[in-house]
Amino acid sequence: MSDFLPFSRPAMGAEELAAVKTVLDSGWITTGPKNQELEAAFCRLTGNQYAVAVSSATAGMHIALMALGIGEGDEVITPSMTWVSTLNMIVLLGATPVMVDVDRDTLMVTPEHIEAAITPQTKAIIPVHYAGAPADLDAIYALGERYGIPVIEDAAHATGTSYKGRHIGARGTAIFSFHAIKNITCAEGGIVVTDNPQFADKLRSLKFHGLGVDAWDRQCGGRAPQAEVLAPGYKYNLPDLNAAIALAQLQKLDALNARRAAIAAQYHQAMADLPFQPLSLPSWEHIHAWHLFIIRVDEARCGITRDALMASLKTKGIGTGLHFRAAHTQKYYRERFPTLTLPDTEWNSERICSLPLFPDMTESDFDRVITALHQIAGQ
């Protein structure tokens, strides 16, 4: 369908094209100076001392958990209402994911659910800043300090999000995503921010074969041509082609997120006349990045199931998303944790639907979505 409206579309323009051309013309297209520029720029955004660019947020999560020494016999607490990559990385390191419930209305993991899951084997807590809103960091970090457990913030949805006046990440260690649907994108990529220099050094080594330096450092830093392997590592570095796009996007972040916020405000106003329930906003002071606009489709209230709504919108040429099917209901995790029940996560997992939301979305696009929702609700 030529006029299909996707639920997300990257906002690319002349700046990104120029950035790519600059890198191509430079003769150095893999990890190099643009990575360094991106890391410095992201530190200015979040207020952290160190940033490590990686090939994806999943890669960032993998090496962050490795840098903490997570392994066999350890437990890591995280909500089930998250993308499965976090659970996968925990399992692949030999540790056990301890999935906890979320608040029914905000879909934020709560400190009460986290504390109830803490055991002597708990070695990390991973809160998720869901859909662009922040989790309650004061309470979560207080738990980490009380029990001596590191906190790694899953900030994949949170570029531009702030909590009580500070950008997400400023409290410690956080992982951001530059995936194609995120608030800023370079197709694929991510970045880890931290204030711990030893942790940052571990990340840099783990992301590039376990070497002490990367190819650009050897090229321009006068180092020996063959670097030393400090410990086995991975190939998770971000090419400068991608870093240059991310830099161009980062310069537009305020404008991109302002447009997202404007569309979200229009959605909230329109929902007053519709039976679909948006997520509630957290009660603490925050700035929402509006990565997603999510409604809950309860058949008893709306007269239609979520899946039927998504199918109906598709026939009208409108795309939607599901963020997320609860991780513990996926086949592998369902079979591994057959007795796990998380009532509020499960209730929402069966009803949530992400509506189209992206900076280049026009007023006509928005009107089309709302008209379709009215038509479906009136059937």
Swiss-Prot record:
GO terms for molecular function: pyridoxal phosphate binding; UDP-4-amino-4-deoxy-L-arabinose aminotransferase. Pathway: Nucleotide-sugar biosynthesis; UDP-4-deoxy-4-formamido-beta-L-arabinose biosynthesis; UDP-4-deoxy-4-formamido-beta-L-arabinose from UDP-alpha-D-glucuronate: step 2/3; Bacterial outer membrane biogenesis; lipopolysaccharide biosynthesis. Its cofactor is pyridoxal 5'-phosphate. The keyword Transferase applies. The keyword Coiled coil does not apply. GO terms for cellular component: membrane. Catalyzes the conversion of UDP-4-keto-arabinose (UDP-Ara4O) to UDP-4-amino-4-deoxy-L-arabinose (UDP-L-Ara4N). The modified arabinose is attached to lipid A and is required for resistance to polymyxin and cationic antimicrobial peptides. HAMAP family: ArnB_transfer (MF_01167). Belongs to the DegT/DnrJ/EryC1 family. ArnB subfamily. This is UDP-4-amino-4-deoxy-L-arabinose--oxoglutarate aminotransferase. The lineage of its organism: Bacteria, Pseudomonadati, Pseudomonadota, Gammaproteobacteria, Enterobacterales.
